[in-house]
Structures are given as structure tokens and as C-alpha cells.
UniProtKB/Swiss-Prot annotation:
The keyword Ribosomal protein applies. GO terms for molecular function: structural constituent of ribosome. This is Small ribosomal subunit protein eS17. Keywords: Ribonucleoprotein, Ribosomal protein. PANTHER family: 40S RIBOSOMAL PROTEIN S17 (PTHR10732:SF0). Belongs to the eukaryotic ribosomal protein eS17 family. It holds the Pfam family Ribosomal_S17e. One of its GO terms (biological process) is translation. PROSITE patterns: RIBOSOMAL_S17E. GO terms for cellular component: cytosol; ribonucleoprotein complex; ribosome.
Amino acid sequence: MGRVRTKTIKKASKVIIEKYYTRLTMDFDTNKRIVEEVAIIPTKPLRNKIAGFVTHLMKRLRHSQVRGISIKLQEEERERRDNYVPDVSALEQDIIEVDPETKEMLKHLDFNNIVVQLTNPTAPGYSNRRN
């Protein structure tokens, strides 16, 4: 099992990451020096624990978002993704190709005003494995 980290270590680490994200790395020694510069931490063991948790969170941030940490770069990326509008809508086509089952479903749902074109469903063919 891992070590239990106190609320102080977690809060301090999150604040340091939010403010100094661009300076921090995946390396403990580098992060230890940065934490020493940017924060007034009374003891050496506490500084090392905070630097260790900062390194741990930076490694997690590399793969995905971490709850409770909002980084401007991530927020801008999320906004850009949310505001994306495609040039051509998939729904505004003149004719939509569907299989007979889907056409029947649309008829039951009273979507008769949509122009659909039937296509023959192609089941995945099984090749002869014994040559």
C-alpha cells in the first residue's frame, strides 16, 4: 500500500501546480528546487513530500486530467473542442443511406419527412480458413 498524504500536502501541491505548471517537470529533484523557490515551507521533510506529490500529479496530468486541478492550457483546449462546429452537417444531407431495419424504425418513430435511401446490408463474410 502507498503512503497516506495529508490535506496540507495535497492542497499545497495542487496550488503549486496551478500556478507554476510551465516550470514543473516529471523529475523529483527539479520539482524539489522549484517548490523551494516558490513556497515558504518550514521543514525539509514537508518540502520533499510536497515535491514528491507534485511529481506524482505531473505524471498523472501527462496522461489525463486530474480532479481539482484546473490548468489554463487544458481549459483552452476543452473550450476549443466544445466550440467546434463541422463545416458540413451529417444531418443536412439530401439522401441518407440506411438499411431496411433502420428505415422501419424511423417509420415507427414517425420520421416520415426524412428522405432515406435503402442499402443492402452486407454481413461480414467468412473466408475459407482451410486452404
